[in-house]
Amino acid sequence: MDVACGIMYDKAGNILMGLRDSRGPNPNYWEFPGGKREDGESLETCLQREWMEELNLHIEIEYLLCTTTNNNVICHFFVGKIIDTENLRINVHQYIGFYSKNDVYKLRLFEGDDKVVDMLK
């Protein structure tokens, strides 16, 4: 299963992180928002769709940072920027926040996501 995840910066240079719902899978972990690719969909289109569905935000994807594999899940991490936060709406996460790269390390991340953060400039 392919999953596209977005490491997206706001105009101040902070990364948007989402706190997963306490009742769903992997509860109370912080994540780079994204989701599963649908049949026939490119990873970039998947990521843009997921950000609209989950956060009501338009994003501009700049590049693929890395790809990781955990069990049968292949995560593709893209870096980019949020076009505008004015219409931000939380639809899936219990909370979202904007964090500096150093502050992202302090969050409860999925195993291995700290290594993804290490790759950021």
Please state what every model-predicted region is.
Residues M1-I15:
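Conserved N-terminal beta-strand and adjoining loop/helix that marks the start
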Residues H58-T67:
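A short coil-to-beta-strand element that immediately follows conserved catalytic motifs
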